[in-house]
A protein has these predicted regions:
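N-terminal secretory signal peptides
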Residues: 1-27
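N-terminal export signals
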Residues: 31-53
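Catalytic-histidine neighborhood of serine endopeptidases
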Residues: 37, 100-170, 180
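N-terminal activation segment of mature serine protease catalytic domains
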Residues: 49-100, 104-107, 170-172, 209-214, ...
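Terminal peptide-recognition signature
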Residues: 72-77, 95, 105, 109, ...
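Active-site region of chymotrypsin-like
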Residues: 73, 178-200, 236-313
Length: 323
């Protein structure tokens, strides 16, 4: 007996031919591909998550190198009076070593920090009229030990200093180290000094751009200064930021307007007036002279650019100009 074909069954059978056959090997390959893609995405996400900390570590390491490079060329200033408190020392600000002892031992700082020690200044003459012993009230510079990080502050050396030149319009003054504190005035005896300052390497300010990293290396805030055996013990500090402005004009603490200055958002406390503004290689790009107004204003610190200092400082050293 012959069975007739069922049209519906035949149609169903024909449709079934359009359904792909189950291929376990192909599915396995797809699973492997998806697994590899997931692993790739996962490792990519992990890499993204690790990028910021890695960059942060690089930045921290560089900042540490900047501090170690610049700090041994940054000095603290103070007025010494044997009848005063804190061992006779009153903090005055910061200076930057411009020339090593062999080249004369010159330090650059802010004019307003040392103005009462400028020869012929009204305040200096007033002290003389009051019969105050000028040989006892001295301007002194604290030269740090060669290794600043972890170094014992007692390895630093105080030196007597004199003002050899000033430019009030730029709020810049140049000092000369005379002799280690307590010695008879004369040329610095390098052999007797515990610490020997080195001149800070000079950078260039002409190629600076807004947004570049900048660091202020100076003396710590005097309000938080530690004492050592009752004496003032300077501590070098650093603040970080960027160059936030170029060719600015700003009122100075001398009543003048300083022109062509650099602006930075790195904090400049008054104890760091005269501090070094350095680039990410630890090279001097400016000397911090002021903040805007009478108080510390975040984002409004100013420095005389090093390209200008290269014109000002040699003239003050050579001609002993007081202006």
């Amino acid at each position: 007996m012959t069975l007739d074909s069922d049209p519906e069954h035949d149609e169903a059978r024909d449709v079934s031919r359009d359904v792909p056959d189950f291929d376990s090997r192909r599915l396995g390959r797809r699973r492997l591909a998806l697994g590899a893609l997931g692993a790739s995405l996962g490792s990519g996400l992990a890499l993204l998550c690790q990028t910021e900390p890695a960059l942060a570590l690089v930045d921290e390491a560089n900042a540490t190198r900047v501090f170690e490079t610049a700090s041994r060329s940054v000095v603290s200033l103070a007025v010494y009076d044997p009848n005063g408190a804190n061992g006779g020392y009153t903090p005055r600000g910061t200076g930057v070593v411009w020339a090593a002892f062999e080249q004369g031992g010159f330090v650059v700082t802010s004019f307003h920090v040392v103005k009462d020690f400028v020869p012929g200044s009204p305040s200096k003459e007033s002290d003389d009229k009051k019969n105050r012993d000028a040989s006892q009230r001295r301007l002194r510079v604290n030269v740090p030990a060669e290794k600043t990080n972890g170094a014992d502050p007692r390895n630093a050396t105080w030196y007597d200093a004199v003002v050899v030149g000033t430019q009030r319009a730029s709020d810049i003054a140049v000092l000369r180290l005379i002799s280690p504190a307590g010695d008879v005035e004369g040329d610095v005896d390098v052999e007797k000094s515990v610490s020997r300052p080195a001149a800070l390497q000079l950078g260039s300010s002409g190629s600076l751009r807004v947004g570049q990293s900048a660091y202020v290396v100076g003396a710590g805030d005097v309000k938080g200064a530690d004492s050592l055996k009752g004496a003032y013990s300077p501590q070098t500090t650093m603040s970080a930021g960027v160059i936030s402005g170029l060719r600015r004009s700003v009122p100075s603490k001398n009543g003048t307007t300083i022109r062509n200055v650099l602006q930075t958002d790195a904090e400049i406390p008054e104890s760091s007036a005269g501090a070094a503004l350095v680039d990410s290689n630890g090279r001097l790009i400016g000397v911090a002279v002021t903040t805007y107004g009478n108080t510390v204003s975040p984002g409004l610190g100013f420095a005389v650019p090093v390209d200008d200092l290269l014109k000002i400082v040699p003239a003050l050293i050579t001609l002993h100009q007081i202006s």
